[in-house]
Amino acid sequence: KYASNADSMKIRACYNSIPAQLAKDNKKFQYKVVQKGGSATLFGASIEWLNLAGVVLKCQRINQAFEPIAVYADLSAFKLYMGDVGLLTMKSGISQQTVLSGEGNTFMGALTENYVAQQLAAKGYDLYYWESSSTAELDFVLQKGSQIIGVEVKKGEHVRSRSLSVFVSNYKPAYSIRLSLKNFGEKDG
């Protein structure tokens, strides 16, 4: 479906805000980043258009991680990732040298998280993230059959994650996943 001129300006504004949205400590989508005084009423249809077109990946917040996970989605809270991490790299203006070295840049965490979102979506997973009363946040929560799986993404080799520990303690999943630059390993808990 083609968008009107007025709608296309809102769509573009939402799309252009994604690097800034992901650069924040709290990556939850905020309409005020798109435009001062922005709201779901003003930009909600634009975000839906981008999502349905496959240009962005919408990751809904859940406050509980039980099967079926979709019924625990908070439709008012979400993150938006670019549908292609290469587009995020280009839109953010981060240099190739910084990406290749992977060091000393806080935006590398956003790129890494976007890459994981893209790969999970390509494998057919619906994207959710978990937040516990604003004290802990887990990057992704997946449902595979009847299993709920927590996924924590770390940009470097520092792998300590209080959020993943809180998630595991609360929900006792069969397993959880921590992605980082460290070599693959398996550990109880």
Language-model segments: which ranges?
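Accessory nucleic acid-recognition modules appended to NTPase machines
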Residues: K1-L142
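A short local loop/turn or secondary-structure capping micro-motif enriched for an aromatic residue
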Residues: F66, S146, H158-S161
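Hydrophobic/aromatic beta-strand patches that form the interior of the parallel beta-sheet core
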Residues: Y81, Y128, V151, Y175-L179
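Catalytic cores of nucleic-acid endonucleases
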Residues: K155-G189
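Active-site beta-strand-loop-beta-strand hairpin of nuclease catalytic cores
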Residues: L142-G150
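Short, glycine/charged-rich beta-strand-loop motifs at protein surfaces that mediate ligand recognition
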Residues: G104-T106, G150-K155
